[in-house]
Amino acid sequence: MTKITSDDVRKVATLARLNLPEDLIDTYTSQLEKILGYVAQLEEVDTEDIPPTSRAVEVTNVLREDIIQETDIREDLINLAPNREGDFFRVPKILSE
């Protein structure tokens, strides 16, 4: 495995647009080297008989079909608004021209 240098960490930080404090560069260098060591260990694991997957556990869709229901609460909801104009909610302006 290639040795990670402080310059490597600075370059990665620049590419990631991170502003790393200079006094922590050595700490991050050591941590990044350990992480890459773990990745190297994972590369040695035999995965020949393991099927490719995108998740560690099986995921099923638990959503239900939408049910359209007629309701009479439109006016009640509009009346709850602190500020309205006719059938519309009035909200503070957030964009300028």
From Swiss-Prot:
GO terms for molecular function: asparaginyl-tRNA synthase (glutamine-hydrolyzing) activity; ATP binding; glutaminyl-tRNA synthase (glutamine-hydrolyzing) activity. Coiled coil: none annotated. Its EC number is 6.3.5.-. It comes from the Bacteria. One of its GO terms (biological process) is glutaminyl-tRNAGln biosynthesis via transamidation. The keyword ATP-binding applies. InterPro entries: Asp/Glu-ADT_sf_sub_c, GatC. It catalyses: L-glutamyl-tRNA(Gln) + L-glutamine + ATP + H2O = L-glutaminyl-tRNA(Gln) + L-glutamate + ADP + phosphate + H(+); L-aspartyl-tRNA(Asn) + L-glutamine + ATP + H2O = L-asparaginyl-tRNA(Asn) + L-glutamate + ADP + phosphate + 2 H(+). It is an enzyme of class 6 (ligase). Keywords: ATP-binding, Ligase, Nucleotide-binding, Protein biosynthesis. HAMAP family: GatC. PANTHER family: GLUTAMYL-TRNA(GLN) AMIDOTRANSFERASE SUBUNIT C, MITOCHONDRIAL. Belongs to the GatC family. NCBIfam families: gatC (TIGR00135). Heterotrimer of A, B and C subunits. Allows the formation of correctly charged Asn-tRNA(Asn) or Gln-tRNA(Gln) through the transamidation of misacylated Asp-tRNA(Asn) or Glu-tRNA(Gln) in organisms which lack either or both of asparaginyl-tRNA or glutaminyl-tRNA synthetases. The reaction takes place in the presence of glutamine and ATP through an activated phospho-Asp-tRNA(Asn) or phospho-Glu-tRNA(Gln). This is Aspartyl/glutamyl-tRNA(Asn/Gln) amidotransferase subunit C.
